[in-house]
Amino acid sequence: MDSSAQVIIANLTSPPVLAFALGLLAVLVKGDLRLPDPIYQGLSIYLLLGIGIKGGVSLRQSELSDVAIPALATIILGLLIPVLAFFFTGKLTKLSEVDRGALAAHYGSTSLVTFTAALVFLEQSSIQYEGFVTTLLALLEIPGIIVGLMLGSRHLKRDVSWGESLQEIFSSRSILLLVGGLVLGFATGTVGYAKIEPFFGALFIGMLTLFLLEMGTLAGRRMRDVKSAGAGLIVFAIAFPIGSGILGVVFGYASGLSMGGAAVLGVLAASASYIAAPAAVRLALPEANPGIYLAASLGITFPFNLTIGIPLIVLVAQSLEGMVG
C-alpha cells in the first residue's frame, strides 16, 4: 500500500472520524444519538478553551519574528479567500449576491473542529508543526466574515447593521474562548499548564471524539438540504476547499512555516465556519438562505474535510516540501 493511501486510511480509521461517521449513520437510519445540549455546549467550551490555552503556552515560547510573517500571510489569506469564494459561486451557481456573500463569509472564516482534527491527525502521524498555529486560527476567523458580508450587502437597498454584526462576531463564544485561552496560556506558561495538562491534554482526543459524534448527527440533518442545493453548489463545496487548501499551503511555505505548519494553514484555508459566520450572517444578511450556506458548509464541506480533505492537504504539503526545501 502506498504512503498516500496509508495517510488517508489512518485518518478514516481514527476514533474521532469514526465517531463522526457513527453520528451520520444514526441520522440515516433515523436513530437518536444526539448528546444533551448542556453536554454539547460543555464540550465546545472545553475544546475552544483547551486549544486556546495550549496555543498561548506555545506562543509564549515563540519569537515575535517567527510569528509576524505567518500572521501577515494569514490575514492576507483571510481577505483573499472570501473574494475568491464570491467569484466562483458566481461562475458555478445562479445564486443571488446576498447568498454568495453569505457563502463567502462562511468559507472565508474557519472551522475550529476541522482545525482540531488536523492537529490530532498530525500528532498521530508524528508530524511537527509550529505551536503558534492557534494564533493563525484566531486571525483567520474574522476578516473573511467581514469581507463576505461586505460583498453580499453591496447592492442592498437598506443599511446593514454593521455595529451589531461586528459586536456579534467579536463577542461570540468561539472568539472569546479562543482568544481568552490564548491569553491564559500565554500568561501561565509551561509551569501553569503542567497543572491542568491531565485535563486539557490526556482527555482531549476522547472529548473530541464525543463532540464529533454530535457533529455527525448535525451534519447528517443538513445533508437533507444538499439535494436541493444544486450541482453547482455541491461542486463548489468540494472543489473550492481543495483549491483554497492548496493556496493556504503555498502561503504557509512562503511565510516560512514548516511542512506541518503549512499543512495546518492549508486546512484552515480549506475549512468553512458553521458557528461564528452563521450568527453574523443572520444579523447582517437576513435575506440569505440558511439552507444554502449551512448545507454547503456543514452538510458537504465539513464531512469532506474531516474524512478526505485533511489527509489530502497534508499530502500536498509533503509533496511541495521537496520543491521548496
Language model features by range: what are they?
Residues 25-45, 60-61:
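Membrane-interface helix-loop junction between the first two transmembrane segments
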Residues 1-26, 37, 64-215, 229, ...:
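Alpha-helical transmembrane segments of multi-pass small-molecule/ion transporters
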Residues 218-231, 237-241:
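Long, repeat-rich segments with strong aromatic
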Residues 51, 215, 236:
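Fold-independent oxyanion-binding glycine-rich loops
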Residues 46-47, 51-76:
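An N-terminal, globular interaction/scaffold subdomain
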